[in-house]
A protein has these predicted regions:
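Short amphipathic, positively biased membrane-proximal segments
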Residues: 1-133
Length: 133
């Protein structure tokens, strides 16, 4: 018996919007994201561009019922794959906040730390779109 395609709900539309916005920014202003790429990885600019294209592809795939399941799985995988970049961003901003000691740097660092657990609800949304939850 074929499975029905999960509906395009608000959470999935939110993920689509997030991916489209972030993906476009990756392509237009890659320098914003290059510092997030873990230092052990080469060719940062190319990785930023590739992740932007992947985000846009996932977003578009989530919109269409025929591709939603595959795009949901790809979206979850992408969110897991970029998690080290989010950790790298927090680590970099922790150093900057300690070095500068100003409120703005400390607040930005706090935001990067708060962002880390927010990745899990996004992954859950992607898996729901794939019909896996």
């Amino acid at each position: 018996m074929p499975q029905t395609t999960p509906p395009l709900d608000r959470a999935t539309l939110g993920l689509v919007t997030l991916f489209l916005t972030s993906g476009a920014t990756h392509l237009v202003r890659p320098q914003v994201f290059e510092g997030m790429v873990p230092h052990v990885l080469p060719r940062r600019r190319e990785l930023v561009h590739a992740s932007g294209v992947a985000e846009i592809a996932c977003a578009l795939g989530l919109l269409h019922p025929r591709t939603r399941r595959a795009a949901g799985l790809a979206s979850a995988a992408l969110l897991v794959a970029v998690f080290p970049a989010n950790v790298q961003m927090s680590a970099s901003h922790a150093k900057r906040a300690r070095r500068r000691g100003d409120v703005g740097s400390q607040a930005f660092f706090a935001g990067t730390v708060a962002r880390l657990p927010m990745q899990w609800p996004l992954i859950r949304t992607a898996l729901r779109a794939a019909g896996r939850l």
